[in-house]
């Protein structure tokens, strides 16, 4: 069955992963009329199945984790790792504007990120690599903030494993250590889930 749809907008976003929705937020805040389209019956894309970590070199929060980093070092790492397969202006744009994007989202959305001091760059042998602090962990986000739209959100990977809730990267890393702290975090997650009766009834 073919459905006709005709609407004129300033900014059309195809897909509801982190890239598309971030672009939609920016366009909306800049005054554009935005339309987001998604081919699936749920939104979130492959981002909904990821840990949500963002790699931001030279960000404004580096003092919180005691690192010294720069956008130039971030560019050097990308160039050393990727080589000539990506144009220089694209790599420069990412290294130079990633923190600007982060600050914009902190100001204009409910999304929050904190740096992970022990989350090192994957390829330490490359020029410009850092031992930690560039990877940013998204903060916990309750589905209640989404209202009725929560019913259409693609569920995360943990729910497919019989776990009816999601967790942050910090929480999941702590659980893997199998020590007293990990058991306490596991208990906190379960308690948070069971006490959140409104969300469980949806």
Language-model regions, residue ranges each:
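Alpha-helix N-cap/helix-initiation motif
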Residues: 2, 16-17, 40
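N-terminal Rossmann-like FAD-binding beta1-loop-alpha1 element of flavoenzymes
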Residues: 11-36
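Conserved N-terminal/central alpha/beta ligand/cofactor-binding core
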Residues: 39-202
């Amino acid at each position: 069955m073919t459905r006709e749809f005709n609407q004129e907008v300033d900014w059309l976003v195809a897909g509801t992963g982190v890239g598309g929705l971030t672009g939609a937020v920016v366009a909306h805040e800049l005054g554009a009329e935005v339309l987001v389209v998604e081919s699936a019956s749920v939104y979130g894309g492959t981002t909904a199945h990821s840990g949500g970590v963002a790699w931001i070199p030279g960000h404004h929060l580096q003092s919180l984790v005691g690192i010294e980093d720069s956008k130039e070092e971030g560019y050097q790492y990308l160039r050393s790792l990727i080589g000539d397969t990506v144009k220089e202006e694209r790599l420069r744009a990412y290294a130079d504007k990633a923190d600007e994007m982060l600050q914009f989202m902190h100001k204009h959305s409910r999304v929050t990120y904190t740096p992970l001091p022990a989350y090192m760059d994957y390829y330490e042998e490359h020029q410009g690599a850092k031992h930690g602090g560039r990877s940013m962990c998204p903060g916990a986000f309750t589905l209640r903030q989404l209202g009725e739209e929560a019913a259409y959100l693609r569920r995360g990977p943990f729910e497919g494993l019989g776990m009816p809730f999601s967790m942050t990267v910090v929480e999941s890393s702590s659980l893997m250590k199998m020590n007293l702290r990990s058991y306490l975090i596991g208990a906190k997650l379960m308690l948070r889930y069971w006490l959140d009766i409104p969300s469980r009834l949806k």
